[in-house]
Amino acid sequence: MEIAGRRVAGVWAAIMSTILSKSEIDAQVRSLGVLVIDDSQYMRKIVRNLLLNVGVREVYEAGDGVSGLEAIRTLEPDIVILDYELPMLNGAELVRIVRSPDVFPLPHVPIIMLSSHADRTRVIEASQLGVNEYLVKPVSAKSLHDRIISILANPRPLVRVGDYYGPQPRRKFPDPIATPRIITEDTPAE
């Protein structure tokens, strides 16, 4: 494989061959069916318009967690965008049900959580539930498009660890109790 006039071999050739072109990404975005679950009709309209503006052609809507869960089951969307705070069944409860492969038929559907809460604990909780991406309202077309591209271009495998079923974490967090190791020139290699 050649990139910028240079021959690339081995691992780099494999990596570069998996990178999607802009036209391939645009085609994938156009083929998506996205379900928006939010109790605010105004917010659903905003997200729907943002999705249509970035090229998504099929946008479905649900106004609460229970109808959203049923819509996931029946419509089988490619991506779900849901509000954290929903009536009848909140976003966290909905994600727990969807990410239960023994109970729910589509545990693999990518989920983007929308919330007006930007605090770290809420983001961590959503991540621990199995959310693929987390966006804070108000959301821009660019940030929503970037998250969709992230899901399409860099899909993370689903893993089951204990009670968790969801996308593999992007990185491991260091153990806060572990003793830091100071490395100097004299430190022996492990």
Predicted regions: what they are:
Residues S21, I25-A27, S150-E190:
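CheY-like receiver
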Residues Q41-Y60:
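Two-component/phosphorelay signaling modules centered on CheY-like receiver
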Residues E61-I79:
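Acidic, metal-coordinating helix/loop segments flanking the phosphotransfer/catalytic sites
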Residues K137:
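A Lys-centered signature of the CheY-like receiver
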